[in-house]
């Protein structure tokens, strides 16, 4: 029997076992265990349903093929052939859907994120582009019914951002935005360019899953907290008190400074949220590096020094270099219509993973 069918049969058995356990009065009375089993059962429900239907379809295909061999009636033959064609189409679709459902899932996919955008090469133009990217992601988040909150920002005099951090919360945020990690290049004529020459600038985007308290433990002894007087805009109140906070995670050397809020406590809360996300991301990146040594993914490496996309304003063109995707609708993409780009990246990643899954295993057919 095909190895994949063996795995599916195992899932079917486990699903039946879970349903039996969840009907046990002792389990029902043990809330935490019942919730754990319920979550596992819900996670298997879709693939079990599709596999159950696939088995029915395979059985119907066998019956129709036998009927086709035995019948001598021409009208019946045509009816059976038509049924077989429909069944084969459904079979192929179910097999593909099941293969995708069997792909290893990213445990972070359902998490909220902290996104950091930084102006990189290109001076003022890079900071302006960082602001444009921020606006693009905010509009996309709005289209997905996600919530956004700016939690840290360093603005520039020209109206852009040296760096800006945003929390995005909602359903499956990380699963869609994790591919945005990397360097984004813009080619356009700056407003200050009198000769009409196209300039090239870059901004980097970091997407980090929100720390939920169980992913990695931050011990108090590993965190150094320094407080100091805030500088810059904010008024006399800020400058008279030590409201700014700098947190250092000693084992990794990661530093977060926060002075945007009016009170030290507010700055502490936001600094800790960013620090937790960065430390978690640091350890995740180390694990990913080990994983990538055995499997390279064109879209999932998350290397922030890698140029992933070019935005060419004169030609209204956006190109994602990882998958060779070019779309001539930059104006709409910058207005938050990222769906086509993100869907293409997800499909490409799934296709890569399917090839990995099928290496050494037979097809379902």
UniProtKB/Swiss-Prot annotation:
Protein name as catalogued: Peptide chain release factor 1
Key words of the record: Cytoplasm, Methylation, Protein biosynthesis
Broad class of the protein's primary localization: cytoplasm
GO MF term set: translation release factor activity, codon specific
Any one GO cellular component localisation term in the record: cytoplasm
Any Pfam family the entry gives: PCRF
PANTHER family noted in UniProt: LD18447P (PTHR43804:SF7)
Record's comment on post-translational modification: Methylated by PrmC. Methylation increases the termination efficiency of RF1.
SMART domains cross-referenced by the UniProt entry: PCRF
Keyword Protein biosynthesis: yes
Family: Belongs to the prokaryotic/mitochondrial release factor family.
N5-methylglutamine, modified sites: 236
Job of this protein: Peptide chain release factor 1 directs the termination of translation in response to the peptide chain termination codons UAG and UAA.
Organism the protein comes from: Latilactobacillus sakei subsp. sakei (strain 23K)
Keyword match Protein biosynthesis: yes
UniProt subcellular location: Cytoplasm
């Amino acid at each position: 029997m095909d190895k994949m069918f063996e795995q599916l049969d195992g899932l079917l058995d486990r699903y039946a076992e879970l349903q039996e356990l969840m009907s046990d009065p002792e389990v029902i009375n043990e809330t935490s265990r019942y919730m754990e089993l319920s979550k596992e059962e819900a996670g298997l429900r879709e693939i079990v349903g599709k596999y159950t239907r696939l088995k029915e379809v395979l059985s119907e295909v066998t019956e129709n093929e036998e009927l086709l061999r035995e019948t001598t009636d021409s009208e019946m033959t045509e009816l059976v052939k038509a049924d077989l064609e429909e069944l084969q189409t459904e079979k192929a679709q179910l097999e593909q859907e099941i293969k995708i459902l069997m792909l290893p899932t990213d445990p972070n996919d359902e998490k909220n994120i902290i996104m950091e955008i930084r102006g990189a090469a290109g001076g003022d133009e890079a900071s302006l582009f960082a602001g444009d990217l921020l606006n693009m992601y905010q509009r996309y988040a709005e289209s997905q019914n996600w919530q956004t909150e700016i939690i840290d920002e360093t603005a520039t005099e020209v109206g852009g951002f040296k760096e800006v951090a945003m929390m995005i919360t909602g359903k499956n945020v990380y699963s869609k935005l994790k591919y945005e990690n990397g360097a984004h290049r813009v080619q356009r004529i700056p407003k200050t360019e009198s000769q009409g020459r196209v300039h090239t600038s870059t901004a980097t985007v970091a997407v980090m899953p929100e720390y939920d308290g169980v992913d990695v433990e931050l011990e108090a002894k590993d965190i150094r907290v320094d407080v100091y007087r805030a500088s810059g805009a904010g008024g006399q109140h800020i400058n008279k008190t030590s409201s700014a906070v700098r947190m250092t995670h000693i084992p990794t050397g990661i530093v977060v400074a926060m002075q945007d809020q009016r009170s030290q406590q507010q700055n502490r809360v936001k600094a800790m949220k960013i620090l937790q996300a960065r430390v978690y991301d640091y350890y995740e990146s180390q694990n990913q590096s080990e994983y990538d040594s055995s499997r390279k993914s064109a879209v999932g490496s998350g290397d922030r020094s890698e140029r992933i996309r070019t935005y060419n304003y004169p030609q209204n063109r956006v190109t994602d270099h990882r998958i060779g995707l070019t779309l001539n609708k930059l104006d709409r993409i910058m207005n938050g219509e990222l769906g086509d780009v993100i869907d293409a990246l997800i499909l490409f990643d799934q296709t890569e993973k399917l090839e990995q899954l099928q290496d050494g295993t037979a097809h379902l057919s």
